[in-house]
Amino acid sequence: MGYDRLGPSGPSNPNQKDPATSLPELQKKTKTKLILFTLAVLVVGVVCFGIFAGIRAVDSGKTEPKLTRKPTQAISRTCSKSLYPNLCIDTLLDFPGSLTADENELIHISFNATLQKFSKALYTSSTITYTQMPPRVRSAYDSCLELLDDSVDALTRALSSVVVVSGDESHSDVMTWLSSAMTNHDTCTDGFDEIEGQGGEVKDQVIGAVKDLSEMVSNCLAIFAGKVKDLSGVPVVNNRKLLGTEETEELPNWLKREDRELLGTPTSAIQADITVSKDGSGTFKTIAEAIKKAPEHSSRRFVIYVKAGRYEEENLKVGRKKTNLMFIGDGKGKTVITGGKSIADDLTTFHTATFAATGAGFIVRDMTFENYAGPAKHQAVALRVGGDHAVVYRCNIIGYQDALYVHSNRQFFRECEIYGTVDFIFGNAAVILQSCNIYARKPMAQQKITITAQNRKDPNQNTGISIHACKLLATPDLEASKGSYPTYLGRPWKLYSRVVYMMSDMGDHIDPRGWLEWNGPFALDSLYYGEYMNKGLGSGIGQRVKWPGYHVITSTVEASKFTVAQFISGSSWLPSTGVSFFSGLSQ
């Protein structure tokens, strides 16, 4: 299909400057990071981080492992749970102390070895930072460095947590961070796949450095989930009570009282730390200046108020170190962050986002995010979110193909309006969209509209898209010609794609088949697509696809697995916008 994610990227711009973010201190920072990881590993009582045993590459479990030592029974039992048992055995045997370790200790060793391999991949990849690269190659390369760095951070937290893991909430954290690390790896390699025929030695070095990383994380997921059986398959994080019919008007317990007050307070009454105003009446005139000024690793909520206006700045980003940032605008359509970058500008999809947020605790309310590149320029992201515990409340996300990138970690969207054409809600976060309006727009000729493209790659990832109590609508231009442009609920980007629509109102622009193939029979057996108690002219299930992975959900117990409380671990952080929300199925 001409509008596939990895299809034509459009003409390149020979006059465009290198879009890469300068990383002059990356190698120094990487060395510092490795030293810090050594201390972290020592703190949790593992073998000194400086003792690194190279992990031999294997054929993903399809060939006999290259062993010089026989695995212990504990290693054999542990690795029997994994999808890549030969790699698992080799990884554990290569790590000092594994031959005397019990199964619980082997989980820790597996995490540690995987962290070391990611750290080594980051360092190896960073050694070519100053190599001259074409713009698209530089974009893919810089994406990989950022994503590998984020993965090292996620795995460090997972390694520290697995030692003291004691309850459902900690289990969910570990699974989330592992899932995020795998997603980051896949996004890195996908970026190089997008630049077909380019990359050369840069691509070879990076892809070589990240070899086996996804499989190693998969093994960590499998052996950890095997120990925590509640987390296999569709994760049910909180097993203490069923929340299928429970309704709560409470604000989430993961928020401090001050944060709850901020979320429920009118904009005019909020004392912001920074005010952005185009007319110069605030602290800064640009959002970029405000983000730069915000503290790193903040343990308290830092509030940036962006006054009404149209802000077009160069690919704004809230990085991983900018934690607990809250952006408040003057309302949808009033405070507008806009841009027009696309893959036609020699960028990977990851780098096209008008606004991106990867810092944990990111919250935004009452704003519009827009990418105006248009359907002819293919992938063009308006908003990308990859921060854990992210909340997007009362916002517009407006684009065409790939408008909203729910990249990774746990996210919650409430009362938002999302506009797009092809795969316009995509990614591999564990995300719930609740009480949102989802608008299909008129695409280019011959295109089919697909609302979701979820890219869960591994059956143990606790990720997916849950669309709960939303409205699926057509924009006026599509409404006038909807017979020519079928709209589908989604298509499977990766093998274990998972999307559920629950208690939502579907317009008659939804095709009776409901769902669309990605490429022939790919993933039709392994995906999980579900529908539960939807209504509207487009909700009929009589002509829906007959794929093995498609489910008409009739059980409240099954449906409850995709609610706020269970799917994104409401017992620990219950996403909220500061107004009433429902943690179970009831509205």
Swiss-Prot record:
TM segment ranges: 35-55
Pfam (any one): Pectinesterase
Keywords noted in UniProt: Aspartyl esterase, Cell wall biogenesis/degradation, Disulfide bond, Hydrolase, Membrane, Transmembrane, Transmembrane helix
Region (Pectinesterase 61): 273-571
Cellular location(s): Membrane
Family annotation (Gene3D superfamilies): Invertase/pectin methylesterase inhibitor family protein, Single-stranded right-handed beta-helix, Pectin lyase-like
Annotated pathway: Glycan metabolism; pectin degradation; 2-dehydro-3-deoxy-D-gluconate from pectin: step 1/5
Enzyme Commission designation: 3.1.1.11
Main location: membrane
GO molecular function, one term: pectinesterase activity
Annotated positions binding substrate: 349, 379, 491, 493
Site (Transition state stabilizer): 401
Tissue: Expressed in siliques, floral stems and rosettes leaves.
Main EC class the enzyme belongs to: hydrolase
Similarity comment text for this entry: In the N-terminal section; belongs to the PMEI family.
Protein name as catalogued: Probable pectinesterase/pectinesterase inhibitor 61
Species: Arabidopsis thaliana
Gene expressing this chain: PME61
